[in-house]
Structures are given as structure tokens and as C-alpha cells.
Amino acid sequence: METGHGKRDALAEAGNLTYTLVLSDTDNDLNAVRYVLWLAGLCDRRGHWRKGVRHFCVVHTGDWLNKFNPRPEALEFFQTLQSSAPDSCSVVLLVGNHEVELLQRVASGIRTRLSEDQLAFIRKQNVLHVSRNILYLHGYPTINLLALLLQVQQEHGELSIFSHRLRKAFYEGEHALFKEREGLEMIGDIRRVKQYYMRGGVDGERYGVRVSRLLQQLGIDTVIHGHRPHVLIQLDHELSAEVPGIRIINNDNKANRTGCGAAVVDWKGYVRFINPKAMYVLGGEKAFRKKICRVLGTGKKRRAAHLPGEHEAVLGSAAQSEC
């Protein structure tokens, strides 16, 4: 049976993934997840894939569970969503600090409601995901992570092998990375983000400038992450002064508190946001879902179409900067 990772890699190579729906930091809240999947026209109200959905990748940037009280039913939902994805679709689950700290607690002998098979499922998920020119990560990219990525690219000419290599080093062995503080830094769990990027190296170059240079060497110009909310709204062009030349998008709007939150990335790299404010401005739930499904081609006509410019402005970055 082909795994979610294998299916995803094959689709990526074929270049058939048209849209990517990005979820972040849902913390056990299946209502928020199901609601977004329904709004986008990918699933029914119960979270089951709709017939006819094609060429979508769902990426969760981590913290799909709560580290203190992980719900088995939340894990089972994502497991089923991943395994039941249509042939031209895939589900990428990245581990966040909640999943990593949960594994750390289990490794130290603390019991959890999750079974051994469910814990094994967590350990099968990736730390990061690269698609075209976009890096998907739980938190913020660090120099150490990007230097490793660049080394793999220089040795093998591609980054597809990196996820497997890092997953092995991250979860396996006596000195597995997930057990250490470095493991959290690897997924971008930086405690003082601006201070980190403003720090100067031995050569005097600021960390943020070096991170920007490494990302550009990797062919990455956009980073989409979760982990830290910005006034309960997604934030586009975050840290543009600290990490020049890189578009950083914070997708964490605390969906478990606001009711919904996601980003949709099309094949050109254009990003649209799903959140309560955009829904309100565009006329409420029914009108909003109709417009989103029209853009994504998941409506009744199954054909993507353009929206008027003023509607696109609400879904795009302009609306986010006003929040």
C-alpha cells in the first residue's frame, strides 16, 4: 500500500498539485478542521472527502494535537483523512512542538491516552515540506536547518530525499533529535524570534540575512508556518525587515478559538486566506463558501473561476495587514 508520503512525492514530481490548503495549530479541534475542509469544498460536514475532488494537497503545519491532552479521535481523523485521500490528492502532516513534546513526555515515561500504534503514526510524519518555491514548517526557519537542507541539495541535487533522512534522524535511535531541545529548534520553535534573526554571527552577518541567503540558495522565496498567532489573524509578509527578500506567512490564527483559519496556495504561489473576518466582509458563511468553491473549482460546476477584484482583495494579503 502506498503511503501518504509516497503518494505526495509522486504527485509533486508529476506537477499535478493545483492547490494547497494549509491548516495550522488546530490543537485537537476537529470542528475547526472539518469546517475549513467543508468551506473549501473538499469534504462534507463530517470530514469525508467529496467525490470528484482532484489535485489538492492539504498541509497541516503542526500542533494538530494538544500535548497535554492528545485526543485519540483527533489523531484518528487525520490518519483517515490522509489514508483516504483521492488518488490525485494528498495530506501532509508536519509535527509541531505539541507533537514533539508529546513524544518527549512518552520517552520520559509519562503515560498518554494514545496507543503505541498512534504514537508510531506521529513518528512517521515529516518535519517540513518543500513544494516548488515554498517551505512549509511549523515555526521559523533556522540557520542549522537550512544549512542541512542545502547540504542535501548539493549532494543529491534535490530535496525530496531530505524528509526521509531527517525523519530517520529525528525519531530513531538512542540520541534521536526529538528528545533534545535541538529537536524543537529544528521545527522552528524559537523562543525570541526577532532577537534570533537580529543576532550577529562571528562574521558580523545578521542571522536573518544569512537565513534569507540560504533560502534563496535553496530556491525558496516563501515560508508558510504556524506556531505563534498574530492577534488571531494570519499575518502576511511577517519579519520582512529581519529576513529581507523572503515572504514569511504566519498562518496561526488560533482556529480553535476563532472557529476557522487556513491559507490556500494556488499553482502560481498566490495565497488566499480563510478566516472569520474575510467571511464577514464577503457576506457570511453561505456567500463566502460559494466564492471560495468558485475560486477552487470545488463548487457545483467543478470549474475554477476568477472573482471580482474587490473580493480577491479581501481574500488576499491586503485584508490581513488591516487587522
Predicted feature locations:
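Active-site environment of divalent metal-dependent phosphoester hydrolases
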Residues: 29-30, 66-69, 98-104, 143-144, ...
